[in-house]
């Protein structure tokens, strides 16, 4: 599964960012997502941009997962890395409609790039949903780009559902048709 970051196939109760690197013990109440930014990055080649040599960030194939206070950045997928069931650069959801979901709260998805040119697999560099459910609560989708079919988010089937609440979409773009958001 070349070009992929984290793959989720089971339920994950919660991934929470915002902890100091100097935290000790078991007290999980001392979180500050603004002061202690937790980053999941696809920037494998270390050049602080999403391009060839980098990888996609999160593939949700099954299960329910909740993520709070995490920044996702520099995810990248090329035409060569994309397949019919795995083609996202940021968060890609491809599971059963009833048993696959992800909920993001107070997160940022930024600077992800989909260089995929095949129409069925292009677009949605921040969030691409083939099948399953995505809930975005106070999520910022910033400066993501694609060749076409959605500069930030793409729902690609009748079993793909995205709910957005209090989200910001800014600076997202694509070179083709079907929407910049």
Predicted features and spans:
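Flexible, solvent-exposed loop segments that connect beta-strands
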Residues: 80-85, 116-121, 176
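Extracellular beta-strand-rich solenoid/capping regions of secreted or surface-exposed proteins
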Residues: 2-14, 24-68, 73-100, 127-129, ...
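Compositionally biased regions
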Residues: 3, 90, 95, 106, ...
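Short, intrinsically disordered, charge-balanced linker/junction segments flanking boundaries
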Residues: 1, 172, 177-181
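Beta-rich catalytic cores
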Residues: 54, 87, 123, 149, ...
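Right-handed parallel beta-helix
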Residues: 17, 64-76, 98-115, 133-145, ...
